[in-house]
Each structure stands twice: as structure tokens, then as C-alpha cells.
């Protein structure tokens, strides 16, 4: 009986843990190229204005499904990214982004025109499309990535 309950619990956990979506593209920064392979959409409160809900697109080289599923607060979701790009959608008139490389030792953040993200799907459960950034003029990255990001986490606390 206990074994049956354990198997049922494991099956339920696997079914409720959202998996990564796909990303196909690159992030290039000062000669280093990262192949982006995984895409996630996270929804939760803004750190500055917790009454405001934002969407966060996370694009990474590594699969962070389990780590993101374990997050209980919004600030955890970007802290898990060691190599990739985090883009805040709905945070203001521009897209806010944060790039990290080499286990977060290299970082760059800036904003982009909303037109740099061309969505083919944009609903409560998924964001898909193309993101193109060329921020080399301010020391930032060049990003060209097609993505299909399912909603993997909807959080209620910013921190």
C-alpha cells in the first residue's frame, strides 16, 4: 500500500512539474557564444511594485525545469540562471533584460524596444516567437533566438 502511494505521488509530481520549452538561437557577448536551447515563462509580482504582475521569459543553455519548479518566490527564478537571458515582459514601456554568462560572473542588463520581441503566440499559458537584440553599442550582447516558452510557474510573492 505504501509503495502504491509512493508511486502515485511520484507520478503526480512528474505530471505537475512543467518541462522546458524550446529555444533555437544564440547569445553572443564579447567573443563568447552560448547556444540557447531551453525556454520558460514565469508569471509573478514585480520586485519594485508587488501589486503589478509581470511575465518573465527565461532562455538558457541548460535545462532548469526542476529548479524553476522548486521556486516559491519570483526572485528565485532569475537566480537559477547561470548562463542565459532573462527578459521581463509587461514591466514597463520597454523590455528589461538581464544576461548572465560563466556562472553569473559576467552580467549585463539593459532595456530593449518591445519590437525586438515578435510573438507568434502570446497567451496566459505560452509565449512563443522570435527575440532579436543587438546591444553591442553599450557593451551588451547580440541575441537571435526563436523560442516556444510554456508557463512553468505562477508565483504570488516577489521575495
For every predicted segment, state its role:
Residues 111-136, 140-142:
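Extended, loop-rich substrate-binding clefts of extracytoplasmic carbohydrate-active enzymes
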Residues 21-22, 27-30, 130-159:
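Edge beta-strand at a domain terminus
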Residues 21-22, 52-56, 124-130:
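Short, hydrophobic/aromatic-rich segments at coil-to-beta transitions
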Residues 1-8:
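Bacterial N-terminal signal peptides that target proteins for export
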Residues 10-19:
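Hydrophobic h-region of N-terminal signal peptides that target proteins for export
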Residues 32-36, 109-113, 141-146:
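Amphipathic hydrophobic-ligand
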Residues 47-122:
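Surface-exposed helix/loop patches within compact recognition domains
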Residues 30-53:
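N-terminal targeting signals for Sec/Tat export/insertion, comprising classic cleavable signal peptides
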